[in-house]
Amino acid sequence: MTSSIDNLFTPGLVAAQQPQWPGGSDGAAVKSAVQELKSLPPLVFAGECDDLKARIALAAEGKAFWLQGGDCAETFVAATADSIRNRIKTILQMAAVLQYYSSIPVVKVGRMAGQFAKPRSNDLETRGDVTLPAYRGDAVNDLEFTQSARTPDPQRLVRVYNTSAATLNLVRAFTQGGFADLRRVHEWNKGFIRDSSVGTRYEEMANEIGRALAFMTSAGVDPDAFKSVDFFSSHEALILEYEKALTRIDSLSGNPYDVSAHFLWIGERTRQLDGAHIDFASKIKNPIGVKLGPKSTVEDALALIDRLDPDREPGRMTFITRMGAANIRKVLPALVDGVTKSGAKVLWVCDPMHGNTYEAPSGYKTRKFDDVMDEVKGFFEVHKSLGTHPGGIHIELTGDDVTECVGGGEQISESDLASRYESACDPRLNHSQSLELAFLVAEMLRDR
């Protein structure tokens, strides 16, 4: 088994966006962390990954809808029970609204339990006359701007595993132990409508859901499906020492799976066809996503499909588009049309966050809620015009009442950003903005 894993990946390939570990990637510190990770139990199981792959195949055919959400970058300090519960609660609330109005299952995926690393535009950060390594996520170094905090530490990869294990333990408890009961989720949504300044717009939608639940209760319908949900984990496969160390051979099928998460995606900055990240993704059997930005071409998309899904396996391949509101209607049609004409079946997911980031005068990175919604709207418009399926959304969000994105029903302004800006990296939709987005997307699903 060990020799199979050791010989699985192509050696000598360039791996973009990797940390500059002290002593190098072959140093004693990295080897020690990797050996420890290799000895640890899987965080997820191959059968769960295959289950998710089957659901992705349904979403690609328009028979399910993908909802993926969570932090831009998880941090160790924020991996508390309250924070994890609030994120799960937000995703469950969004899913209930989307599922009712689409009348199809919603595949619930957390951008959590592993999203501890981030690619960066620059290796270094300068403040005044001090230059230090850039913060690459808690998997690599610390946000504090000191030499010791910013020095990459491979032992943090072991802490990523331990924190992810604790997070997944809570996720499973919350989603299987009654917390996720659909009737409880509906009561939460009623609370949002009661307390939100835009709640009246969605009151009738919520009342419809309430009447449907009341009817089923009166008819004696009480299925187990009401009481628990299936919830999957995902993160960007970025730090290859971590991902390779957590790749295992499944005892039943004999196939390799990355057991750090159910779903892994390759980012826009690391999807080089001849690079180590695509080589890694091509060798594992998990469902795989790839981010496509505004400069992506049909040729790029088709080459990625050939490399990652040569057998055209249903549910294997997801494209997560991150175009920006100004580009989505111009760039996406050719991509979707070209892939569709090739005969490949992929899931198309809209990431309306990363293409709409800008710096406010105060220096905070932020996003306009209206831009986020406009990109989602453009995504739906393109698929409707082509007769294809808008398969899902990928949202950076938190369950907390932060002030990181401007606009929405709460009318957060650029001057409000400083009041509660907590993200370690990019701005996230807060709880209220996330639910508002879900109600707006539900209207699009109803009319698709």
State where each predicted segment sits.
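Glycine-rich, charged/polar anion/phosphate-binding loops
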Residues: D51-K53, D274-H277, L304, P333-L335
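Short, glycine-/Ser/Thr-/acidic-enriched flexible segments
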Residues: C72-E74, M112-G114, K295, G324-A326, ...
